[in-house]
């Protein structure tokens, strides 16, 4: 645990330490146990510090982000991620325990799956599966209008409401796959669509979900309608 932000960050790191065990359990239940346990966590004291520790880039991409899992380098052939860490933004100190657990579980999944995830993996799917691991299966709101396409990386690119809805749609899709085909199939789909040397999305949908893009979209829409009606 690395404290870069003083007393408040120390309190946050203590809360992370108190909740890391349940996060490990949640990730293992979905992903398995073949991933490193030397978990590095960094708590930052300013937004600029967070952006630097998170890897830099345009400041807008870090707006509304509570934490991020990053690595300095990944060696896919050896399944090793070098310099892995979970970095918390300064605003994370004010999160409730339930919110902190969701963020911690989400980022720990990325940490666990990093060495098996391609650099060019569809981000929306990596985020949707991470949210499946992290978020409780709460009832869905009424979804209107129904999505006319699967989620995309562009849905997650813009800060604010668009990003929030993009994450929700990606999560709903991951829940749909797990609910209709089982969590093991969702894991297999992640590996097929996001793993090193992954297939393109239509091929992964065909090979793992046994459908085509139009069919899986129609099935997802029907699932969303059923869930919203509950």
Feature annotation, model-predicted:
Residues 1-108, 115-122, 140-141, 156-158, ...:
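Juxtacatalytic substrate-recognition/specificity segment
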Residues 71-79, 98-103, 108-111, 115-230:
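Acidic/His/Gly-enriched intrinsically disordered linker/tail segments
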């Amino acid at each position: 645990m690395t404290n870069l932000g003083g007393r408040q960050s120390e309190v946050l790191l203590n809360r992370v330490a108190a909740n890391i065990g349940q996060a490990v359990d949640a990730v293992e239940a979905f992903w398995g146990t073949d991933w490193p346990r030397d978990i590095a966590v960094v708590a930052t004291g300013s937004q600029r510090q967070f952006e630097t520790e998170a890897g830099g880039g345009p400041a807008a991409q870090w707006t509304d982000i509570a934490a991020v899992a990053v690595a300095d380098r990944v060696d896919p052939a050896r399944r090793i991620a070098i310099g892995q860490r979970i970095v918390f933004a300064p605003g994370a100190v004010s999160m409730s325990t339930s919110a902190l657990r969701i963020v911690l579980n989400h980022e720990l999944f990325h940490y666990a799956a990093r060495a098996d995830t391609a650099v060019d993996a569809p981000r929306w799917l990596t985020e949707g599966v991470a949210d499946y691991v992290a978020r409780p299966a709460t009832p869905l709101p009424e979804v209107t209008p129904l999505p006319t396409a699967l989620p995309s990386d562009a849905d997650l690119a813009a800060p604010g409401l668009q990003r929030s809805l993009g994450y929700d749609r990606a999560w709903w899709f991951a829940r749909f796959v797990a609910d209709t085909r089982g969590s093991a199939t969702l894991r297999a789909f992640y590996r097929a669509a996001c793993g090193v040397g992954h297939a393109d999305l239509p091929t992964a949908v065909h090979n793992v979900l046994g459908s085509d893009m139009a069919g899986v979209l129609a099935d997802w829409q029907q699932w969303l309608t059923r869930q919203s009606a509950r």
